[in-house]
Curated annotation (Swiss-Prot):
Its cofactor is Mg(2+); Mn(2+). Belongs to the prokaryotic GSH synthase family. The keyword Transmembrane helix does not apply. Mg(2+) binds at E282, N284. The gene is gshB. This is Glutathione synthetase. HAMAP family: GSH_S. Gene3D superfamilies: 3.40.50.20, ATP-grasp fold, A domain, ATP-grasp fold, B domain. Keywords: ATP-binding, Glutathione biosynthesis, Ligase, Magnesium, Manganese, Metal-binding, Nucleotide-binding. The keyword Magnesium applies. One of its GO terms (molecular function) is ATP binding. Residues 127-311 form the ATP-grasp domain.
């Protein structure tokens, strides 16, 4: 393959991001520094006609300046097969709109390298993919059956109940064995979600943090520890979690070694896994975050390592 000139960035609109913690911004900034031309578009601007995939896009220039971080050019209708690389970076929810975009991008890959591979993104939902490694996980139940969930809670004691396709800590509940609101919680989930939900044993180690580990082409390259707020079980930064520097433990390296081959096999060049204590809880392949935080705490320049891996794939 030839080198990289044009990079499409499929993302939520650049005007709405917070650059201090946005991994898509970090990835795009590194691409710009390498001399690539960036083309910005949102998923709703994708089209398929006569077997070709188009997007209404704008050339994008970035600056690492809060409040003045981007300039967009005029709208252009672009045949996405003219892109060398496309970054698939819109945030979940992992709904039919998201799934449809992966079908369209699959028409382009691998001649145009889509990061991550859209077919495998579609076939590897983050809270289901992880169940391929049951010995690395906490006890987990995926179901919509309230009786099954009640039995699971009786067995486990405290549990976490969360949407199967949510993100950012939204809709995550900690329910104790004696929770009087448990029936109401199940009723609320039944009304809100048509698909199954996920129940997981509560891990007290979350009070010490939920570690986000970043992997490039199956190899761990950096990590941060996300500590939840005092009265919250969620460590996501969106809901008040606090990031801190960390190193990988022997157990965490073992987890990375176990899952690395599966990530490489599926073309996942950039992945973020979540580990609580000794347990793997999620494998994030859609739009993982953490690049800027790792660098902020003196860790690797993950965006640079990622583009090194992309260039190697394109060579």
């Amino acid at each position: 393959m030839a080198g990289i000139v044009n990079v499409g960035v499929q993302m939520d609109h650049v005007s709405g991001i917070t650059i201090a913690g946005d991994s898509t911004f970090a990835m795009s900034l590194e691409a710009q520094a390498r001399g690539y031309r960036l083309f910005h578009y949102t998923p709703d601007k994708l089209s398929l006609r006569d077997g070709r995939v188009y997007a209404t896009a704008q050339q994008m220039q970035l600056r690492d300046v809060r409040g003045d971080h981007f300039t967009l050019g005029e709208d252009e209708r672009i045949d996405l097969s003219t892109m060398d690389v496309i970054l698939l970076r819109q945030d979940p929810p992992f709904d039919m709109a998201y799934i449809t975009s992966t079908h369209l991008l699959e028409r382009l890959h691998p001649k145009t390298l889509v990061v991550n591979d859209p077919a495998w993104v579609r076939n590897s939902p983050e809270k289901i993919f992880v169940t391929e490694f049951p010995d690395l996980m906490p006890k987990t139940l995926i179901t919509r059956d309230p009786d099954e969930i009640a039995r699971f809670r009786q067995e486990m004691g405290d549990i976490i109940l969360k949407p199967l396709y949510g993100n950012g800590g939204a809709g995550v509940f900690h329910s104790a064995r004696d929770d009087r609101n448990f029936s109401s919680l199940l009723e609320m989930f039944a009304q809100m979600f048509r698909e199954p939900y996920i129940a997981q044993e509560y891990l007290p180690a979350v009070r010490k943090g939920d570690k986000r580990i970043l992997l490039v082409d199956g190899e761990p390259v950096g990590a941060i520890n996300r500590v939840p707020a005092e009265h919250d079980s969620r460590s996501n930064m969106h809901v008040g979690g606090r990031a801190e520097a960390t190193d990988l433990t022997a157990r965490e390296r073992e987890i990375c070694t176990r899952i690395g081959p599966a990530l490489k096999e599926r073309g996942f060049l950039f992945v973020g896994i979540d580990v609580i204590g000794d347990y793997l809880t999620e494998i994030n392949v859609t739009s993982p975050t953490g690049i800027r935080e790792v660098k902020k705490f003196g860790g690797a320049d993950v965006a640079s390592l990622l583009w090194d891996a992309i260039e190697k794939k394109r060579a």
